[in-house]
């Protein structure tokens, strides 16, 4: 049995979010939350929120034991990019890409 949680259109770069995902992939849920709590990155708090949501979904919707849960899969896929323009010298303008992510967490019960 597995439980999922997703956060879509999160205003964090998928590359930066992916680095944080690599830290907790395969870990126990409580251990992963402890790691994320002390990780000094902006994406860590967002990912922690999604992991907590997956844990709550497992407990309430699937009646799974929260002590045995581990992160089976965690990915930060690329969402749509917002394009903004920044004025530069001599009448030019450059694009600034504000990237978004779709974060998906799947938790399973250890046997």
From Swiss-Prot:
Keywords: Ribonucleoprotein, Ribosomal protein, RNA-binding, rRNA-binding
Gene Ontology molecular functions: rRNA binding; structural constituent of ribosome
GO cellular component: cytosolic large ribosomal subunit
InterPro entries for the chain: Ribosomal_uL22, Ribosomal_uL22_bac/chlpt-type, Ribosomal_uL22_bac/org-type, Ribosomal_uL22_CS, Ribosomal_uL22_sf
A Pfam family per the record: Ribosomal_L22
BP GO annotations: translation
Family label: Belongs to the universal ribosomal protein uL22 family.
Function: This protein binds specifically to 23S rRNA; its binding is stimulated by other ribosomal proteins, e.g. L4, L17, and L20. It is important during the early stages of 50S assembly. It makes multiple contacts with different domains of the 23S rRNA in the assembled 50S subunit and ribosome. The globular domain of the protein is located near the polypeptide exit tunnel on the outside of the subunit, while an extended beta-hairpin is found that lines the wall of the exit tunnel in the center of the 70S ribosome.
Record text on subunit structure and interactions: Part of the 50S ribosomal subunit.
Family matches, as HAMAP family: Ribosomal_uL22_B
Protein name: Large ribosomal subunit protein uL22
Organism per entry: Clostridioides difficile (strain 630)
């Amino acid at each position: 049995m597995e439980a999922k949680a997703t956060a879509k259109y999160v205003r964090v770069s998928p590359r930066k979010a992916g680095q944080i995902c690599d830290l907790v992939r395969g870990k126990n849920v409580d251990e992963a939350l402890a790691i994320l709590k002390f990780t000094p990155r902006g994406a860590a708090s967002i990912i922690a929120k999604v992991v907590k949501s997956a844990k709550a979904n497992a407990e309430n919707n699937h009646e799974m034991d929260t002590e045995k849960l581990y992160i089976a899969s965690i990915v930060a896929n690329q969402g749509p990019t917002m394009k903004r323009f920044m004025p530069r010298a001599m009448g030019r303008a450059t694009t600034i890409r504000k990237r978004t992510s779709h974060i998906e967490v799947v938790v399973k019960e250890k046997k």
